């Protein structure tokens, strides 16, 4: 009996260390000045590609926040975490909505994650939504918020977020999809890129999937309504139809997984991407990792 108790307490101790010790031992403070190399999400994808026999290169180009189009920054905040500068890591309204949807559907599908939570997951954890991983994510989110500035959290997120198979970070995404640096993304291009973040392997910013059309339309509409879009785009806007907010279509998801709910909009004709050539005259760090 005594042996069983010892085994039980050892098991509990190991479990608690895995649950709490791992996220507490990670060196989060190094992120103040150092850019992470391979993230947990990148490693996870590399294992997937190896298992599937795919030869995929990780394309990532580090870029400072001040070299990213303000339209892209605003579009991502609108799409993923509109309360980013107001909360301390958690959007409890978003979590409440996610829980209600999970209970309604009977499975852990929605997470209500903020940008800080997504960064914690991308850097250190697996994509799993099991309770243990969510607790670890919460601990890491608190540590990130207490250690890093909001500006640095946003900069890290935009540089490690997944934007397609092997494409990580906004600079690599801007060059891959639009042939330009992230600094020169237009409002419409920014809206399209932000729209696919919830599931970048399923959705393509250059495609015509109804979900992407509606979500990017919404993001663009909000940017216009808030006065984010500058005057030079007014002539282009005059050529488009008036923006309206229709009722959501029956079979179309109103929001992406892991983000607070948003309404949907009707599609808008896509603007042609600028022909400006990609700029490489600022401090960037390009990384290509080929899956063995």
Residues of each region from the PLM?
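Juxtamembrane regions of bacterial inner-membrane/periplasmic proteins
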Residues: 2-292
């Amino acid at each position: 009996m005594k042996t069983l108790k010892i085994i039980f307490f050892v098991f509990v101790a190991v479990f608690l260390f895995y649950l709490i010790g791992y996220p507490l031992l990670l060196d989060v403070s190094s992120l103040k000045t150092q850019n992470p190399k391979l993230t947990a999400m990148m490693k996870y994808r590399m294992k997937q590609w190896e298992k599937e026999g795919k030869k995929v290169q990780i394309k990532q180009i580090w870029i400072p926040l001040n070299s990213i189009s303000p339209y892209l920054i605003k579009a991502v905040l609108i799409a993923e975490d509109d309360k980013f500068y107001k909360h301390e890591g958690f959007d409890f309204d978003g979590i409440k909505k996610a829980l209600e949807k999970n209970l309604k559907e009977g499975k852990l599908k929605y997470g209500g994650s903020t940008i800080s939570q997504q960064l914690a997951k991308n850097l250190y954890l697996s994509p799993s939504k099991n309770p243990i991983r969510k607790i670890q994510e919460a601990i890491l989110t608190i540590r990130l918020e207490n250690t890093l500035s909001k500006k640095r959290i946003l900069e890290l997120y935009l540089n490690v977020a997944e934007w397609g198979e092997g494409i990580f970070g906004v600079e690599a995404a801007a060059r891959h999809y639009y042939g330009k640096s992230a600094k020169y993304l237009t409002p419409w291009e920014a809206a399209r890129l932000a729209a696919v973040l919830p599931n970048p392997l399923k959705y393509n910013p250059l495609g015509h999937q109804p979900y992407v059309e509606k979500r990017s339309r919404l993001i663009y509409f909000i940017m216009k309504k808030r006065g984010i879009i500058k005057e030079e785009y007014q002539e282009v806007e005059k050529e488009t139809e008036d923006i309206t907010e229709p009722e959501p279509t029956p079979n179309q998801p109103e929001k992406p997984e892991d983000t607070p709910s948003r309404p949907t909009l009707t599609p808008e004709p896509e603007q042609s991407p600028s022909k400006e050539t990609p700029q490489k005259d600022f401090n960037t760090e390009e990384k290509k990792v080929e899956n063995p």
